[in-house]
């Protein structure tokens, strides 16, 4: 009997206590609205700061000038992406810290299995080939907005670094990191089916992720929803945010490489 008691006690020690969600339902709604506002404000702030630094005096005398010329200037946009990244990553970490969470745990910043990584890379390649074929058949050119940026950037490497490496890092941190976790943890009670949280989080964050890409048309936005769902699936399968970040970098890298190959 003593041994049984001990065994049950040790069992209590080994199962970690269930973590209370960092955010209430209302909290998740406010977090989503707040993060989206922060997303747009940080972009504007980034363009303003970079515009002040980079644009010639004739183009940066008024705020309207800075936004008008800056948003079509490759160097300004590249720098604004980097400024935005720093601001948004800092805000995300701060929000988690304020709510008493562990950022590494909450954002799933941990290694993933190579097998899952290779499998997801395969899935991404299938998607990329399919969307490429569809883009060709429908005669779309989704990267038209890059033209003025490419033509005006001081170094094409700056544009590549900002769009291929930096943008995926903070976009994943927000959409498949902070918002995804905040939504998933609303569905941890036993009354919900096992995958309910992941499905809801994936659909909601993917739609929001697509909507923020205002520079695209409806066809491109629908492919972005599918792409975002693939990134969500990678987060679920690997239990890590690092895999979606890597896949996002591969995707943006392939798109940029193709754009440069066509432009050259």
Task: Give the residues covered by each predicted segment.
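Short, Lys/Arg-rich, polar N-terminal cytosolic tail immediately upstream
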Residues: 3-23
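Alpha-helical transmembrane segments and their helix-start/interface "positive-inside/aromatic belt" motifs
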Residues: 19-36, 110-121
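Alpha-helical transmembrane segments in multi-pass membrane proteins
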Residues: 32-96
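Functionally important transmembrane alpha-helices
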Residues: 38-48, 199-214, 218-264
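Juxtamembrane helix-loop-helix connectors linking adjacent transmembrane helices
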Residues: 54-78, 98-167, 185-188, 259-260, ...
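Membrane-interface starts of transmembrane alpha-helices
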Residues: 64-87, 154-159, 192-205, 240-243
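Hydrophobic core segments of transmembrane alpha-helices in multi-pass, intramembrane catalytic enzymes
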Residues: 84-88, 159, 223-231
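Membrane-interface helix/loop boundary segments of multi-pass membrane proteins
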Residues: 170-204, 233-240
